[in-house]
Amino acid sequence: MGLSDIPANYMQGSHPHLTLHPQQQHHQNQQHLQHLQQMQQLHNAMPTPAQQAAQVLAMESNELLMSTKDKLSSKKKMHLLKKIKKRFGLVRRSPSSCPGPNNLPPLQFHSVHGDNIRISRDGTLARRFESFCRAITFSARPVRINERICVKFAEISNNWNGGIRFGFTSNDPVTLEGTLPKYACPDLTNRPGFWAKALHEQYCEKDNILYYYVNGAGDVIYGINNEEKGVILTGIDTRSLLWTVIDIYGNCTGIEFLDSRIYMYQQQPAAIPMATVPAQQQQMPQPAANASSALNSHHPHQQSRRSLPGHTAAIEHDLERHVMPSLQSLHLAGNGGSVASVEQAAIAHDLANGLPPLRYNANGRLIPVPFHNTKGRNVRLSQDRFVASRTESDFCQGYVFTARPIRIGEKLIVQVLKTEQMYVGALALGLTSCNPAMLQPNDLPNDSDFLLDRPEYWVVSKDIAAAPQRGDEIAFFVAPNGEVSISKNNGPAVVVMHVDQSLQLWAFLDVYGSTQSLRMFRQQLPNMVAYPSQPQVNVNASSSSACNAASTSRMLPMTESMSSLNAGATAKLLHHPSQLSVAQSTSTLASAGGVNGSRMISMPSNGDILQIQPNGGGTVLVVNLPPASSSHDINGQLAARPTATVTSSGVLAGACSSGTLISTTSSQYIEQPIANSTNNAANKWKDSLSDQQSTDSSAECTICYENPIDSVLYMCGHMCMCYDCAIEQWRGVGGGQCPLCRAVIRDVIRTYTT
């Protein structure tokens, strides 16, 4: 800065004692010049007040701008992250996590509604009394932001498809009277000011409770039974009043508005915080005597415990860690400590690996079932082949097979380990006579229905469990009459299909749709024992029977005997065919075919049948035993009864007496009684069977009642119609279903009698 940069008033007004007149410039004092130079140097060293103010303002503005940008950037990032989490349902909230108004009256239905709607119960219950549409309803008052609408599914029908549609509208329902369309989606949603979406049909179950609300950002969050599912709608205009709109569509025929305040209060967990529990109780497991009461106290909240907030996770973990082993030890106490320790070790292993313990089928000895190496291309098996998991990016090709054929009456339990609600559909169950070892991965189609086109015997039932959840247990078994029954979570068994029980069948599962991972168990039957091959039969001798004395030990030909019982090791008589039992594990089975030809004999506890199944392959022989009423007096005639042997030709070979095979089709066997006192009962039973079979063979068609039955329905296998009526039924008359079991008819096979 030079002299030219000095303000003009600096030399004139600011410092009058330093003012220089032009006539005195040549006569200025040297001291004055030095003083001026010093003042100029000082002026150059420090900025002017204006410059100082400008610098300060610039620095403050830069700091403010930078801090504002940083704050805005961080806020935007956090807001964007939260929005992404909410959109994908990654943020789980309980009904009390989002504050909403609690001073509003309970919701009621508006007087403006669809033609098929009837309002009752003080305006809180809406029913659709006919058809499946024209059932649009509104709330009687506008709803607030974050106000939760709780809807209970009061009535459900199975005659339709689809579920309710729900959402919001900014149009006053009064203005819509007389102009409501049939459907909310898409008739109403195509108009401005309407937002609605369909609820998945799997959630539309009786007594389920749907809750939803709209937040300030215009997102609609919904949940089922106190478990939040995520965002279902976006872009709601929250600047105006909003009424909720519900279309009672499809299978949902009746809904009820619940008071959200009461519902939220009832759903609050009543768990005791861990801090209030004494240290001794936290460290020590519960006694076995108190285990049952502990479980009963938690049982009503089992469904809600799955969605409890994170602070109760420790309580749930301790419950599974201490109570469940104690409960397992209750029914295993009589079997020895080693068995109980094995069961507890298995439960501990499951909990350590994050697998849910068995809850509904814990009674009885359960054995894990390994899966076959043959599987679908999108399935991964664990190292021990006990757990099957489908890849998350695919929804099909999840086939897994049992490693061995199943047995008649054997109970198999499938436990669901993981689900994904993004996909539609669920687990499929099937049975086949095809050995999985003969299949290639390319032989398995994406849709399990196409397995029916293969030359082998295949039966499939899709969606065996409606919307399975983690921990659900689906049990199934094949009855002696070919019925395949399924029960979910130890509920009532339902017959889903009929199979040919005379074939050797492998079970298979299609880990499809929402089902992601599962494992399988089988229940050990106490009266199903595998016997080694030992081609001889020891028959107990008795002094009261001469023929038994002559044939105490009898060798059976290798080509004749299929399987028989040897009770020599147990020194016990087989009292009657209807009372066959395996007393001890030391019993042996005389079987043909060498070491590899061992057989499996199954005698259910009801004593009505005798099942003999070859492990290496072949036809399963099922013998229907006579009723116990035709038995002779055990005390008086027991010694006169020889032990019988079931042969491959269907004839019973015994020491003195032989049996009669009534029909090779039904494999019903009658043994000729020796005692005269039993002739009448046996003859009556034989005559009744003969009359029944003659009646069945000449039975009339259940449709026309004129022609005899001469057709078989595929896949259920029922014979109830003549061929002409079956063809008409198959082509759509009556819905193309079997009139007995309502199974879909896929083919009609004509039969001929000689």
Curated annotation (Swiss-Prot):
Renumbered residue ranges of the record's region Disordered: 280-308
Domain NHR, chain residue ranges per copy: 106-260, 368-523
InterPro entries with a match to the protein in the record: B30.2/SPRY_sf, Neuralized, NHR_dom, Znf_RING, Znf_RING/FYVE/PHD
GO cellular component: cytoplasm; cytosol; nucleus; perinuclear region of cytoplasm; plasma membrane
CDD domains from the UniProt entry: mRING-HC-C3HC5_NEU1
GO terms of molecular function: DNA binding; phosphatidylinositol phosphate binding; ubiquitin protein ligase activity; ubiquitin-protein transferase activity; zinc ion binding
Pfam families assigned: Neuralized (PF07177), zf-C3HC4_3 (PF13920)
Broad class of where this protein is predominantly found: nucleus
Name of this chain's protein: Protein neuralized
Keywords: Developmental protein, Differentiation, DNA-binding, Metal-binding, Neurogenesis, Nucleus, Phosphoprotein, Repeat, Zinc, Zinc-finger
Keyword Zinc-finger: yes
Lineage: Eukaryota, Metazoa, Ecdysozoa, Arthropoda, Hexapoda
ZnF RING-type span: 701-742
Gene of this entry: neur
Biological role: Involved in neurogenesis. Interacts with other neurogenic proteins in the specification of the neuroblast versus epidermoblast cell fate.
Positions of post-translational Phosphoserine modification: 338, 341
Compartment list: Nucleus
Biased composition (Low complexity): 280-297
Gene Ontology biological process terms in this record: asymmetric cell division; compound eye development; germ-line stem cell population maintenance; imaginal disc-derived wing morphogenesis; long-term memory; mesoderm development; negative regulation of lamellocyte differentiation; nervous system development
